[in-house]
Amino acid sequence: MDYIKQAESTQLSSLSLSRLEGNNAEESKRLLEACAQDGFFYLDLRDHKQLLVDYEALLEIIKQYFNEPLDQKMKDDRKSDTIGYEPVATSAGVLDGLPDYYESFKVSWNQLRDHVQELPTVVETNIEVFDRFAKYVHSILLMILSRLSQTMGRNNDNRFESYHRDSIATRTNLTFLKYPKQDTTEHGVGHNKHTDVGTLTFLLSGQRGLQRLTPEGWCHVEPRSGFAVVNVGDSLRFLSDCVLSSVIHRVLPVGAHQTEDRYTLAYFLRPEDDAVFKDINGNLVSARSWHDRKFDHFRASHNQQKNDTILMGGMEENQKFLQYKFQA
């Protein structure tokens, strides 16, 4: 297993959601620096009590859901990357030759926004809290894009939020992940290294396991009560002409194997499907095609993954992290 540096919670910037909502110029500057230099930052939610209450409520709901028998959960399997249930061991994992070891449940933003009638029962039964939480986090991430656009001097159709029009189809979704307790890693482990496909990711978890890759090696990203972890995805990196950093990360047990059930809530903001940008090779691609190619690559074997840069978004070469320096 790779050498992992000690916790780096003090090394990542902590930004105030309240100050960003208030359009504080200094906080917006710090936001840009964090997204360009680290690609990750902590977002202080402690002034937003309802958001934290809703997170705790959703966590309890999803724990009960994941504890249901597999055959019951498989009724929500839609064979989709944005909707429904997916069992463990469907993609390549952290260890060579072994699959991942997490299960997930996804709720599409398109479904919630459009109030479709075919939502999974667990969502339909608790629609108020799912709807309120997703809409608030969605608005927070659009606000963050607006602050980045403003600070970088981007105008009109060139603003980042203009690629996220509300009425257009998108791969955006709310995802819940469970890394089940294990006695061994022989059946799979963790979540393989990757960059996120979309614009911004909003993570909440009270348990350790998330690591990001730096030029010095793998570093823990410590959970902090009352804070979300936000990170830049490939689409935002490409839309920013690679000024902003989509950083490689993974999830691993803290010890030799997963000693307790680990839960994560993730909101993945992604551009509208037809948004177009240049990828790492300079090719024009749509957000939908980049998303679909990347998720197909997640399911490929480790040997197949080594023949393409898409899983790491072009941020790794010969097992080394590529760092793009930000000049203020």
UniProtKB/Swiss-Prot annotation:
Q: Where is the Fe2OG dioxygenase domain?
A: 170-271
Nuclease listed as a keyword = no
**Superkingdom as given in the UniProt entry:** Eukaryota
Q: How is it used?
A: Pneumocandin B0 is the starting molecule for the first semisynthetic echinocandin antifungal drug, caspofungin acetate. Pneumocandin B0 is a minor fermentation product, and its industrial production was achieved by a combination of extensive mutation and medium optimization. Inactivation of three of gloP/GLP450-1, gloO/GLP450-2, and gloM/GLOXY1 generates 13 different pneumocandin analogs that lack one, two, three, or four hydroxyl groups on 4R,5R-dihydroxy-ornithine and 3S,4S-dihydroxy-homotyrosine of the parent hexapeptide.
Identify the residues that bind Fe cation.
H194, D196, H249
Q: What is its EC number?
A: 1.14.-.-
Which residues bind 2-oxoglutarate per the record? R262
Which PROSITE patterns does its entry note? FE2OG_OXY
Query: What are the alphabetically sorted keywords of the record?
Result: Dioxygenase, Iron, Metal-binding, Oxidoreductase
UniProt GO molecular function: dioxygenase activity; metal ion binding
* Cofactor detail note: Binds 1 Fe(2+) ion per subunit.
Its annotated function is as follows: 2-oxoglutarate-dependent dioxygenase; part of the gene cluster that mediates the biosynthesis of pneumocandins, lipohexapeptides of the echinocandin family that prevent fungal cell wall formation by non-competitive inhibition of beta-1,3-glucan synthase. The 10,12-dimethylmyristoyl side chain is synthesized by the reducing polyketide synthase gloL/GLPKS4. The thioesterase gloN/GLHYD exclusively interacts with gloL/GLPKS4 to maintain turnover of the polyketide side chain.
Q: Which family does it belong to?
A: Belongs to the iron/ascorbate-dependent oxidoreductase family.
Would you tell me the protein name for this molecule? 2-oxoglutarate-dependent dioxygenase gloE
Species of origin reads Glarea lozoyensis (strain ATCC 20868 / MF5171)
The UniProt gene name for this protein comes to: gloE
